[in-house]
Design a protein with these regions (language model features):
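Phosphate- and other anionic-substrate recognition elements at nucleic-acid/protein interfaces
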Residues: 1-143
Length: 143
């Protein structure tokens, strides 16, 4: 960014504040739109990893992990500000987590999620399936 070392913490706080403010506004606008037709019951985030970026030795990879952590944290805070429960799920263990919570085999859940996408026009790839399963888990936890 070109900021001097002494300015870096101040710049980081300012930029983090901007990200959090924009995220809160965006989530509030989305909730306003959705709540006209239905009630949003929670937020489920599917992430690649929850590893502490400080443990990553490679600067480039650590920067990406910090960016992911920033946006994940901003969305979690925005959900709390909107009084919505928020859960974060790791993608690579998503089906195992769901199998444990639903007390059903992961293979049965994969089939059920695949079936959910049959009437959907457009893509129903891994991202859409993960989002559907995460939403299912969130709905289960709020009931």
């Amino acid at each position: 960014m070109g900021a001097r070392s002494s300015e870096a913490p101040r710049v980081e706080r300012r930029l983090r504040g901007i990200v959090e403010r924009v995220t809160r506004r965006s989530l509030a606008a989305l909730l306003g739109e959705y709540n006209r037709a239905r009630r949003v019951r929670g937020v489920a985030l599917v992430v690649g990893s929850t590893i502490d970026p400080a443990t990553i030795g490679n600067d480039h990879i650590r920067a990406h992990a910090l960016e992911g952590q920033l946006f994940r944290t901003a969305l979690q805070r925005a959900a709390r500000a909107s009084r919505l429960p928020c859960t974060t799920l790791v993608e690579r263990t998503l089906y195992e987590t769901a199998a444990e919570r639903f007390k059903r085999p992961a293979t049965a859940l994969k089939s059920a999620v695949a079936e959910l996408g049959q009437p959907v026009e457009g893509p129903w790839r891994a991202d859409e399936k993960a989002a559907a399963l995460a939403a299912w888990l969130m709905l289960r936890s709020v009931h």
